[in-house]
Design a protein with these regions (language model features):
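Sec-dependent signal peptide cleavage junction
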Residues: 20-33, 37
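Bacterial Sec-dependent N-terminal signal peptides
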Residues: 1-12, 22, 26
Length: 356
């Protein structure tokens, strides 16, 4: 494995370690902006393949009953990528500038991935169930940490790992009492967009209010929402964008600008078909997370991704692969071609502080 890939793997691990959630119910998150290219909708193959390879990055574990709060927030670490050189004067104008920003062999860029997960509509630091302020939840508090992290390293990608739109009275109000209308932006995504989130994925609780509601929310999210394991049960076509390639202009260790293309994809636990059976039965199929990522990684590489990032709304799990497991973060991190993984869903910290 190249030095870049190894460091990218560590990046994912650190991202997972620092990713925290603001939650009173259950899982993880997402984000906007940046130039992106979409991927074609394709059929999902059903190969039962156990992952192999060495470990790359992950975070957080799970229990799926609506539980209490969670933390919130996020920085990560550095990685060196195949970057580029600063532009010089040229008769070709912008074309020459574009070429000058392309990565060159041996160029190193420190990149920080910032993540949130399992926000569960906790916009402010207030526990609505106990009707009092709470210091361990709230996107408003996390926003300060995000700004501080960006000041420390401007080469950042800010993403959300799902379980974003459910969990407090705000989530219920915007889904049941005064539902998000066609063309209206959900308050959670309005806040994430304001903070500069660039991509996100779906958690299991995104499906609590049905597919029609979820579509309205995603359509106005203001950022790419990706998922690679939810497909049409008849055609096998992806229901959501399976990935996005996000082009970021970073500055290398020598002060030269370079463009790095980050391929972002995501998964949700297949168990949503049981947890939300009334909303989902016969309408979608949810493929094994490991197989879905195994299939999509080569497509992202072919589309030009320098780095691959998996937003795994899943706990870490273990080193024993069983098809259809709920928590497959470890297995996904072990797949060839996966550079970084963000996990969540379990409302747990990794490392835990007790050696696990």
């Amino acid at each position: 494995m190249s030095s870049f890939r190894k460091q990218a793997a560590l990046l994912g691990l650190t991202a997972a370690v620092f990713a925290a959630s603001t939650a009173q119910a259950d899982e993880k998150v997402t984000n906007p902006d940046a130039s992106t290219t979409s991927t074609p909708v394709a059929n999902q193959s059903e190969k039962s393949v156990a992952p192999t390879g060495n470990e790359k990055g992950t975070a957080s574990e799970k229990t799926d009953a609506p539980t209490k709060q969670d933390e919130n927030a996020t920085p990560v670490t550095s990685t060196n990528t195949k970057p580029s050189t600063e532009t010089t004067s040229s008769k070709e104008g912008s074309l020459a500038d574009d070429k000058a920003l392309q990565p060159t062999e041996g160029q190193e860029v420190d990149v920080r991935i910032l993540t949130t997960t399992d926000l569960h509509t906790n916009l402010v630091n207030y526990d609505y169930y106990q009707d009092k302020p709470a210091e361990n939840v709230g996107l408003a508090k996390t926003a300060v940490l995000i700004e501080e992290a960006k000041k420390e390293n401007s080469n950042t990608l800010l993403v959300d790992n799902g379980d974003t739109i459910q969990g407090t009275p705000l989530g219920t109000y915007k889904a049941i009492v005064n539902p998000v209308k066609e063309g209206e932006q959900h308050p959670m995504y309005a806040a994430l967009q304001k903070l500069g989130f660039e991509a996100g994925t779906l958690g299991n609780h995104e499906f609590n209010y049905g597919l029609d509601y979820l579509k309205r929310v995603i359509d106005t999210a203001g950022m790419p929402i990706v998922n690679a394991n939810v497909v049409d049960p008849k055609t096998g076509a992806y229901v959501y964008d399976p990935y996005k390639i996000i082009s970021k202009t970073f500055v290398d260790k020598n002060g030269r600008k370079t463009t790095v293309k980050i391929g972002v994809t995501g998964i949700v636990p297949p168990q949503i078909l049981s947890w939300d059976k009334a909303n989902l039965e016969g309408k979608i199929q949810v493929n094994d997370s490991v197989e879905a990522i195994q299939k999509i990684i080569p497509e992202m590489r072919k589309a030009g991704a320098d780095i691959t990032l998996v937003l795994s709304h899943s706990g870490i799990g273990d080193d024993k692969y069983e098809k259809g497991e709920e928590n497959e973060g470890y297995q996904i991190a072990s797949l060839p071609g996966v550079d970084a993984v963000v996990t969540g869903h379990s409302h747990a910290e990794f490392p835990s502080g007790n050696g696990t």
